[in-house]
Curated annotation (Swiss-Prot):
GO CC annotation: chitin-based extracellular matrix
Signal sequence, renumbered to the chain: 1-15
Descriptive protein name: Cuticle protein 2
GO molecular function: structural constituent of chitin-based larval cuticle
One protein family per Pfam: Chitin_bind_4
Length: 183
């Protein structure tokens, strides 16, 4: 009996944690390209808040915050035709570059501006000339909506009603439902 107890005690002690092996700490950074979260350094998870000021009144709101890892954010807004706000935020990217974004959000949507954000390509000269020509013609009272206008195209209207749909009464009633299943 003593032998069984000693063997069990040795087995429990030998089955303990392995020295030098540390279980990895996983951090979920939210949805995105990385299916298991964005890899991030430990400092980012535990960054202290250096400044956090906020005020909410019946006229609107404003807030400002700073963290020790270089993240800064500020915004102010009022309630008029929905919420109209403007603000900015900045942070240091994984590549060490400082990224800054200024934005407005109102009835026209969210509009962000930043040096690192993509910009649309320029409008081709031919399109610009065409828009200017259309504006001049409209100012002169010429309205050319193109050669096709469904409401003024009598031939298209006549062809559409040439063969009216007729109900076929000699067809048996369909007792089968959707995809052939009986109800």
């Amino acid at each position: 009996m003593k032998l069984i107890v000693v063997a069990a005690l040795i087995g429990v002690c030998a089955g303990g944690a392995l020295p030098g092996h540390v279980a990895p700490q996983y951090y979920y950074g939210g949805p995105g390209y990385y299916p298991h979260g964005r890899p991030s350094p430990g400092v980012e998870r535990n960054a202290a808040i250096l400044r956090s000021d906020s005020e909410v009144t019946s006229q609107g709101f404003q807030y400002v915050y700073d963290t020790e890892n270089g993240i800064h954010g500020e915004a102010a807004g009022v309630e008029a035709n929905g919420i109209q706000s403007q603000g900015a935020f900045s942070y240091t990217g994984d590549d060490g570059q400082q990224y800054a974004v200024k934005y407005t959000a109102d009835a026209n949507g969210f509009q962000a501006q930043g040096a690192h954000l993509p910009t649309p390509p320029p409008i081709p000269d031919a399109i610009v000339r065409s828009i200017e020509e259309n504006a001049r013609a409209e100012a002169a009272g010429v309205y050319n909506e193109g050669s096709y206008n469904v409401y003024n195209n009598q031939a298209a209207f006549a062809n559409r009603h040439q063969y009216p749909y007729q109900y076929q009464s000699n067809r048996p009633y369909n007792t089968l439902g959707y995809h052939g299943y009986k109800y």
